[in-house]
Every structure is written in C-alpha cells, then in structure tokens.
Amino acid sequence: MFYDRASKGEIAMSVNINIRNAVKRYGNTTVIENLTLSIRGGEFFTLLGPSGCGKTTLLRMIAGFNSIEGGDFYFNDTRINDLNPAKRNIGMVFQNYAIFPHMNVRKNVEFGLKNRPADKRIDKKLIHGQADKFLKLMQIDQLADRMPAQLSGGQQQRVALARALCIEPDVLLMDEPLSNLDAKLRVEMRTAIKEIQNSVGITTVYVTHDQEEAMAVSDRIAVMNGGVIQHVGTPKNIYQRPANTFVATFIGRSNILKGEMEVEGGKAVVSLPTGYKAAFDTVAPENLKKQPVTLCARPEELIVETGEGEGLKAVIDSCVFLGLNTHYFVHLLSGEKAEIIQESSIDSIIKPGTQVRLRLNTEKANLFTQDGSRNLLTGVENDLVKEAV
C-alpha cells in the first residue's frame, strides 16, 4: 500500500545531498573540476550564476541526465553515480514545463505514479487520491479536466510542479522554472513555490540566473562562476558579506573603488579617491596591515550630501525619482562613476551638475584584497570553506 508520509505528519522527503570532488568534461573541455558541496535535507538550495557557469550541468549530474567524469554523489549514504535516473526517486521541473499536450491536467499529474516499475505500482484508487492531494495543494483541482492548451503559463507550471511532487520524490530539482513567465507572474509563482516547499519539506535544488528570485526563495545559495562555487550561504550572508568581488557585483549592484589601507591606532583607515579617508572597525585582525584594497559599496551604502565637509567629491550626472527612493548617477572628480540610492527627500531633488560629496556607510560596505579574491572583514560566513575543511 502507498505510504503517504506527509499525511502522517512526518518531515517528508528530507534527503541530504553530498557531492565530493565532482568533475564534468565535454570532450577535452573541463566545465566542472573538483567541486564539493553539501545540501541539507529539507532545505531550499539554489544554484545561482551567469549563463554558462555550470549550474544546470551540476543539476543534471544530480539528476543522472549528465555523465560524471569524477567524484562522488550521495543521497544520504547512498552513492548514486551509477544509479539509473528512474531509480533516484527525483522530481524534475523544467524551464519549458514539459507537460504532455495530449493529456488533461489530472492524467499529467498521475503520469509518474502510473508508470512506476512493476514492483512499486499502486492501486488506481490510491493514485487518484494522491493526485487529488497535489492538485489541491497547487490550487489547480478545478482545472483537472482541462487540456494544457487551455491553461496559462502559470497554471502549466503548477501542473508540472504537482506532477513532480505527486510521486513523493526524495529530491525536487527545478531548472529555471519561472524564466518563461512574465514579471508579475514570476513573483506570484516564486512565492507559491516557496510556500509549497515549506509545507512538503522536500530537499529542493533550484537553478536560476535571477538574483532577486534566488534571494526570495532560498534557504541557502551557492554562487557559481566558471564551474567553480564562489560562496555558499544564506541570502543575508551573501548580500551583506560576499566572499569576493564577483559575488559582490553579481548579487545586487555595487560601486567598486580602489584604495590604500593603513593602520592607525589599531584600526584600518582606507584612503579613497579625491582624498577621502574612511575608518573601518570590522577588518579581521589578521588582515590589519598596510595594503592596497578594493572597496565595494552598494548604492544604498553611499550617502549624497551637499555643502562643505568630508566625503568623496562628485558631480551629479543624472537622477531618477522612483517614489520612495531617488537614484543618483554621479562621477567622482577622480573620474570613477557611481550609483547611489537614497530615500527621496520631501524637498527638491539634487539637480544634475551639482557638486556633492559622498559619505560611506563603513558598517555595511565591504573591503577586499586588491585582486578582489577575498573579503578582509569579519563576519564573512562561507559554508563552502567549512565543507572543504
């Protein structure tokens, strides 16, 4: 008889995924080399990065759709390298939905259960009941008799997700599932997906290049570039204390400035363009030394002020009023360009051509080595480093 773990009140489908020293090659080209990653049972884990970074390749290696040229993949204690994809008990949601156009919604959702191996088949009544449960969970039970051509993009994606979950997989894999939806529907669906994942408790690996989407749905994120994982952490950790300048500039927007760090009275003082000096209290003790540095300041971490005083000297090039916030685009007198997001004032907006000064919020801004490869501040939490130890 089919065992319904979710209805028993258990934490269903909670499987750890452990990847050790993974290698993927296409001919003589190595696209992933010596990649190690641990995904916790029940978490919503996102692989985030630009096109061609290897995120979908890694997802397909987990699924069994791509060959593995090196390393080990585990679901809990079971090594899955040579396990047939059909026996991995995974649910997969694709970018193009991949629902069957000749089947109605109910038949699509029931498909996985009806086509299980002979030793795992269940009674038709149980299949019907299981489909009902996930049709209701996805709020598409009223569409059960419709054909895919009669559905909107969002409804089709709900069908694809219901079909993937109906087999009660150990792992749910999602490859850019929202990229074909319009902006408003993407926001609605990402909220629905996160709520459903929380209620079901399934280990979920999600692929996207959309930073905001990743921040909204994920328990943790792995930022990838060139087949290499750069940073693994919570959305908050990755945004506030990125491991390197790639992560800092890929997650959100950042202004990059070169500076020189010196130590005065046991604290770091960074000399920046136009003669502005900023004191940092959060440089890690082992990094407190005279050295060239790279400063990363997000638009909201710079404050525009007029009049005399300390700050980076700049000129307003243009501004965009967006209600709550105003975006200022400036150039420093030393030549660099910067963007600032500031809460809109009840008074007039600062006009283009006005000379201003920019003050830096040193509690939030980040300092990196000159080459940008390492964050020099305390509070950087990178689970990738912990896993490698």
Model-identified regions with their sequence ranges:
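ABC ATPase nucleotide-binding domains
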Residues: P85-G91, Q95, I99-F246
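Conserved coupling/switch loops of ABC nucleotide-binding domains, chiefly the family-specific signature
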Residues: E69-D72, G226, K258
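Helix-to-loop junction immediately C-terminal to a conserved catalytic motif
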Residues: A63
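The feature captures the beta-strand-to-loop junction immediately N-terminal to the Walker
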Residues: L48-P50
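Non-catalytic connector elements of ABC transporters
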Residues: S254, E264-V389
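Conserved ABC transporter NBD signature motif
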Residues: G71-R79
